[in-house]
């Protein structure tokens, strides 16, 4: 069964749709300048696909927490959990097929990177017999893959880069 996610209109006025099954079989990078509509496009994609596929959103700015109330995503406030607790939450989300929003708002860059890496690590370390299609969205992904350590420790950068690499 093909699930067409309506994203807008073509220049000719016809509906522009994305095949969800095709999207889940590959990777997608949404890139653009500030104000170009990246967040709007991601929200549309998430809202349209929510009934069809498990989702995990890594949300550094709290922009997607409203999906919890509207679509039933479990919102996890990373600030309230240890790295080990977030790893366990990632494992449980995968096993029980729960859509989640990992809210990283309020944490400094180091802790955002560490906690996102722990949660994603939990998702990926679960036995393969629990793997089902999942749409993973990392908003502001550049925050989790810095070219140099800068304001964060080398260890946090390494953990975060490892988690981002697992998504590829």
Segments the model singles out, each with a brief description of its role:
Residues 29-36, 46, 114-168:
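Conserved P-loop NTPase motor cores
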Residues 39:
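Walker A/P-loop
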Residues 24-25:
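Pre-Walker A (P-loop) beta-loop-beta motif of ABC nucleotide-binding domains
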Residues 1-16:
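N-terminal pre-Walker A segment at the start of P-loop NTPase domains
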Residues 16-20, 29, 43-122, 150, ...:
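Switch/coupling segment of Walker-type NTPase motor domains
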């Amino acid at each position: 069964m093909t699930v067409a996610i309506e994203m807008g209109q073509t220049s000719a006025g016809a509906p522009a749709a994305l095949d969800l099954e095709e999207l889940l079989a590959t990777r997608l990078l949404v890139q653009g300048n500030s104000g170009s509509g990246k967040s709007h496009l991601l929200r549309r994609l998430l809202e349209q696909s929510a009934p069809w596929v498990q989702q995990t959103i890594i949300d550094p700015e709290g922009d997607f927490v409203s999906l919890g109330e509207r679509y039933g995503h479990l919102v996890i406030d990373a600030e309230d959990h240890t790295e080990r607790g977030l790893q366990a939450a990632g494992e449980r989300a995968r096993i029980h097929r729960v859509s989640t929003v990992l809210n990283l708002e309020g944490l400094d860059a180091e802790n955002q990177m560490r906690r996102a890496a722990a949660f994603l690590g939990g998702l990926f370390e679960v036995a393969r017999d629990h793997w089902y299609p999942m749409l993973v969205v990392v908003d502001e992904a550049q925050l989790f893959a810095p070219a140099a350590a800068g304001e964060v420790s080398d260890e946090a950068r390494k953990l975060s880069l490892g988690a981002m690499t697992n998504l590829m």
